[in-house]
Amino acid sequence: METTKPSFQDVLEFVRLFRRKNKLQREIQDVEKKIRDNQKRVLLLDNLSDYIKPGMSVEAIQGIIASMKTDYEDRVDDYIIKNAELSKERRDISKKLKVIGEIKSSEAKSE
């Protein structure tokens, strides 16, 4: 079975397609994030509508908003902590994989 060497144009086309695929993936993630953000805004407004009743004072409405803000800030803090924990675990796994790769590489060289 004979393997054919890809032409320079084939390599350029492959790189172009791969870069386009990555760009599309980033754009899709960006659009999905915008969708999630706007869905959250709609939900927030729905929640706010549930709490605000006719005849409420401005102070009562401001109290509700302040309470909601505190709740959301607490959630953000929790997500920041969770993200840091996940990042640490990812770094630890990367280090282990690197060590395993180095061991496999040295075993292959000694054979």
Curated annotation (Swiss-Prot):
One of its GO terms (cellular component) is cytosol. Keywords: Coiled coil, Cytoplasm. Its main location: cytoplasm. Residues 14-41 form a coiled coil. Pfam families: DUF496. It is found in: Cytoplasm. It comes from the Bacteria. Pole-localizer protein involved in the regulation of several cellular processes. Belongs to the pole-localizer TmaR family. This is Pole-localizer protein TmaR.
